[in-house]
C-alpha cells in the first residue's frame, strides 16, 4: 500500500500497514458534551472525516470509533447551573453535535460509544492496573495511576519525567504519592448528583477522563488499533495517559500510528473564551455556508495551524466558487469509478497518499478546473466532481452554490438580464451597462458567453 502517515509517536512518516489486512481500525477522541461544538471540534471532525473517506477510497474497510465523553466535571457543573439532569444536558448536546456534523458533511463514525455505557469495563481496567502495581487508592478514596512505575511515560509527547517534575509547582495533594500521578477513579463528593456516581469496589464515584478512552478503545477495537487520533491539545496529557493505562495493562502498543490535527487560531492568536475570540460552529455557519467552512478547513494540511479570520473564510468561498463555476460551465459526465492513471487523478492520489496532503490535492483540483474551462470537456468536469467527492466537496448544484445569498430573487434578476439583453440589441449600451452596475452594487455579477448570460453572487 502506498499510503503514508505522519506518526506523532515516531515523529516520522510511515506506511500504513493494517494489523488486519484490508481493515483499518481507527479511534479518535471525541467531544465532552457540556456545550456547543466550536471551530476546534469542527477541525478535528473534518480532518478525520477526510481520513476515513480516503481510506475507503483506497479500498480499505474502516471501523471508525469516535467517543462521546458524557460524564465529566464540566458536565456536572453545567447541569447543576442549568438545573437539569446530566442525561438531559448531554442528550441535548449530542443532538447539537450531530446537527453541526451533518451540516459540515461529516460522515457518522462506525460507532459512537458514550463513556457512561462502559463504566464496568473501566473498573475492570483499573483493577488490572492495580494488580500490576500501577494503580493505588489514595487516602481520599480516589484511585490514581503511579506514573513513575510505567517506564515508557513521556514517549508520545517527548517529555521526560524530570522535565515534568520540574514543571510541577504544586504540593502533593489529595493523597497522591507523586504530583505526576493522575486519577483513574474519582470518589463521589456529597454535593454531587446521583447520576454522577457509580458503585464500585472503591466506593461510589466516577471514572477519570483518561481511563474512559482506554476502556472504550480496547473494548471496541482491541488491544492495538491501527490509528489513534485527536487534536494536538490531547497529545499531552490525555494521550500520554492513555498509553500508560492501556499499555500498562496489556503490555502491547495501544496504536500503530498516532495522528494529531493542528490548533485553530483567530487572527493568529490562540482561540479561547477568555480572549473573546471563541466561535462555535453555529456562529460561523450563521455567516458562511457549511461547504465553504469545510473547504476552509480542508485546504490547510491537517497537521498545520489553522488561522480563522473573515478574510480567510471569504477567500475560501471565492476559491470554492472557482471550482463550482467550472462545473456550472460544463455539465459533468458521471464517473462510475476514477481512473487513477489519469494525470490529474494520479497527482491527486499521490498528494493524498502522502499524509493526506489536502493542500496539494486541492491545488490539483484548481488546475483541473482551469482545464475544464479551456476544453469544455464533460469527462474532465466529471473527474473534478469525483475528486471533490473524495474530500466531501462539490456535490451540490453549482447554480445553487453560486447564486446563494442573492439580495434579489432569481425571477427579478432574470427580468433585469432580459432588459439588459434587449438594451444591447438596441445598441443602448449605456442602459445595458447601468443594469450591470446596478446588479453588481447588489453583489450580483453577470457573466456573458456565447450561450447567454449567467449570474452569481460575489462576496
From Swiss-Prot:
Gene: cysS
EC number: 6.1.1.16
Entry binding sites for ATP: 273
One annotated Gene Ontology cellular component of this protein: cytosol
Database matches in SUPFAM superfamilies: Anticodon-binding domain of a subclass of class I aminoacyl-tRNA synthetases (SSF47323), Nucleotidylyl transferase (SSF52374)
Gene3D superfamilies in the cross-refs: Cysteine-tRNA ligase, C-terminal anti-codon recognition domain (1.20.120.1910), HUPs (3.40.50.620)
Annotated compartments: Cytoplasm
GO molecular function: ATP binding; cysteine-tRNA ligase activity; zinc ion binding
Binding site for Zn(2+): 29, 213, 238, 242
Family (UniProt): Belongs to the class-I aminoacyl-tRNA synthetase family.
Keywords, in A-Z order: Aminoacyl-tRNA synthetase, ATP-binding, Cytoplasm, Ligase, Metal-binding, Nucleotide-binding, Protein biosynthesis, Zinc
Enzyme class per UniProt: ligase
Names of required cofactors: Zn(2+)
Cofactor binding note: Binds 1 zinc ion per subunit.
Protein name: Cysteine--tRNA ligase
Extent of motif 'KMSKS' region: 270-274
A matching Pfam family: tRNA-synt_1e
Family annotation (InterPro entries): Cys-tRNA-ligase, Cys-tRNA-synt_Ia_DALR, Cys-tRNA/MSH_ligase, CysS_C, Rossmann-like_a/b/a_fold, tRNA-synt_1_cat_dom, tRNAsynth_Ia_anticodon-bd
Summary of subunit composition and partner proteins: Monomer.
Motif 'HIGH' region in this chain: 31-41
Catalytic activity from the UniProt record: tRNA(Cys) + L-cysteine + ATP = L-cysteinyl-tRNA(Cys) + AMP + diphosphate
One annotated GO biological process: cysteinyl-tRNA aminoacylation
Amino acid at each position: 500500500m502506498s499510503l503514508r502517515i505522519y506518526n506523532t509517536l515516531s515523529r516520522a512518516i510511515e506506511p500504513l500497514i493494517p494489523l488486519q489486512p484490508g481493515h483499518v481500525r481507527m479511534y479518535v477522541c471525541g467531544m465532552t458534551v457540556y456545550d456547543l461544538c466550536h471551530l476546534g471540534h469542527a477541525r478535528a471532525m473534518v480532518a478525520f472525516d477526510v481520513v476515513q473517506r480516503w481510506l475507503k477510497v483506497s479500498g480499505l474497510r474502516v471501523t471508525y470509533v469516535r467517543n462521546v465523553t458524557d460524564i465529566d466535571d464540566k458536565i456536572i457543573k453545567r447541569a447543576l447551573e442549568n438545573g437539569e439532569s446530566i442525561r438531559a444536558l448531554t442528550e441535548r448536546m449530542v443532538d447539537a453535535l450531530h446537527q453541526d456534523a451533518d451540516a459540515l458533511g461529516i460522515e457518522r463514525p462506525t460507532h459512537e460509544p458514550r463513556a457512561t455505557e462502559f463504566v464496568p469495563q473501566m473498573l475492570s481496567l483499573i483493577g488490572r492496573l492495580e494488580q500490576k502495581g500501577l494503580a493505588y487508592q489514595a487516602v481520599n478514596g480516589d484511585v490514581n495511576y503511579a506514573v513513575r512505575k510505567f517506564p515508557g511515560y513521556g514517549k508520545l509527547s517527548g517529555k521526560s519525567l524530570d522535565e515534568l517534575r520540574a514543571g510541577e509547582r504544586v504540593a502533593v495533594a489529595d493523597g497522591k504519592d507523586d504530583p505526576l500521578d493522575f486519577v483513574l477513579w474519582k470518589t463521589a463528593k456529597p454535593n454531587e448528583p446521583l447520576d454522577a456516581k457509580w458503585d464500585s469496589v472503591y466506593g461510589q464515584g466516577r471514572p477519570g477522563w483518561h481511563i474512559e478512552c482506554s476502556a472504550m478503545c480496547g473494548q471496541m477495537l482491541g488491544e492495538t488499533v491501527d490509528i489513534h487520533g485527536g487534536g494536538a491539545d490531547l497529545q499531552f496529557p490525555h494521550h500520554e495517559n492513555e498509553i500508560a493505562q492501556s499499555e500498562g495493562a496489556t503490555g502491547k502498543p495501544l496504536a500503530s500510528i498516532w495522528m494529531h490535527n493542528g490548533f485553530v487560531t483567530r487572527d493568529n492568536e490562540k482561540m479561547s473564551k477568555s480572549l473573546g475570540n471563541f466561535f462555535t460552529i453555529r456562529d460561523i455557519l450563521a455567516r458562511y455556508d457549511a461547504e465553504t467552512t469545510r473547504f476552509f478547513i480542508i485546504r490547510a494540511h491537517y497537521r498545520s495551524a489553522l488561522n480563522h479570520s473573515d478574510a480567510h473564510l471569504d477567500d475560501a468561498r471565492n476559491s470554492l466558487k472557482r471550482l463550482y463555476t467550472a462545473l456550472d460551465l460544463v455539465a459533468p459526465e458521471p464517473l462510475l469509478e476514477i481512473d487513477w492513471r489519469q494525470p490529474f487523478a494520479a497527482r491527486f492520489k499521490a498528494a493524498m497518499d502522502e499524509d493526506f496532503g489536502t493542500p496539494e490535492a486541492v491545488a490539483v483540483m484548481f488546475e483541473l478546473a482551469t482545464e475544464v474551462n479551456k476544453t469544455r470537456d464533460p469527462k474532465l468536469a466529471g473527474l473534478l466532481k469525483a475528486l471533490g467527492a473524495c474530500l466531501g466537496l462539490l456535490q451540490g448544484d453549482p447554480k445553487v452554490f453560486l447564486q446563494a445569498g442573492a439580495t434579489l430573487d432569481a425571477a427579478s434578476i432574470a427580468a433585469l438580464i432580459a432588459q439588459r439583453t434587449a438594451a444591447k440589441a438596441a445598441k443602448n449600451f449605456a442602459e445595458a451597462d447601468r443594469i450591470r452596475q446596478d446588479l453588481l452594487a447588489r453583489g450580483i455579477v453577470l457573466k456573458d458567453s456565447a450561450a447567454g448570460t449567467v449570474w452569481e453572487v460575489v462576496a
